[in-house]
Amino acid sequence: MKKIFTVIFIFIFTSTAFCEVNKKTVLRAWKNITRAENFSELPMNFESDDEPNAWVAYGDDGDYSVHVTTSLMKILESENEIAGVLAHELGHIQLGHYNNFALSDTVRAIMGANLERADDLAQAVGNINLELKESKFSREQETEADNYGVKVLVKANYSAWGLYNAMKRFDENDLGTEANGFNSHPASKERLANLANQARNQSQENHREKNKDNNNNKKDNIDSLADILMGY
């Protein structure tokens, strides 16, 4: 009986850890990530593209939208991994990395426009549609978004190793050579080492917090029991 239970447990564990990443998985992960940060859930768009990628777009209406390619879903193997990618992208938004691109693109539009009237200026600015898929972040910004992403993963009750494992998929498939979106930079040894270090630290911190909560709960239970006994 014990052997049967062990087999069932292993099956359940592996089936949840390694599952197909489909649209429903992506939407659920995005909802959990944004909820953990009290961030308004942005529209999610799925793109049929041979390039595994994820990025944020900035529309004429001033709103962000998130884009994930079907190829990305194919190479990832768990909800933890897609959650890591989405947490990384949210990091770029929350840390203000897109603001610089928006400002520089506005300046380029104004400088390059034939401004004969004030209306031309308004039109030049109004017609800007930033395809932030083409954004090129610095290594410092990528590291900041990575560190942010790992923290949010734990906060949303995902594995701290989700983003690290996602980057490993890119590395194993020789991806990350296109200068845009999530795969802006190859999964270098330094970047993977930093992600592993962040994941370990967050896992340990999360473990300490849980132990602290458990100890506090035990103390509360003992105090409650003492109060009951004192009442007799």
Specify the residue positions occupied by each region the protein language model found.
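Post-HEXXH active-site segment of zinc metalloproteases
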Residues: 98-127
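Metalloprotease/metallohydrolase-associated module, dominated by Zn2+-dependent proteases
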Residues: 31, 118-167, 191
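Peri-catalytic and regulatory segments of divalent metal-dependent proteins
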Residues: 18-106, 151, 155-158, 172-176, ...
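Sec-dependent N-terminal signal peptides
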Residues: 4-14
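Active-site metal-coordination segments of metallo-dependent hydrolases
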Residues: 20-27, 95-100, 130-148, 182-189
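Long, well-structured alpha-helical subdomains associated
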Residues: 138, 159-215
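Surface-exposed, interaction-prone regions with an acidic/low-complexity signature
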Residues: 115-118, 125, 191-232
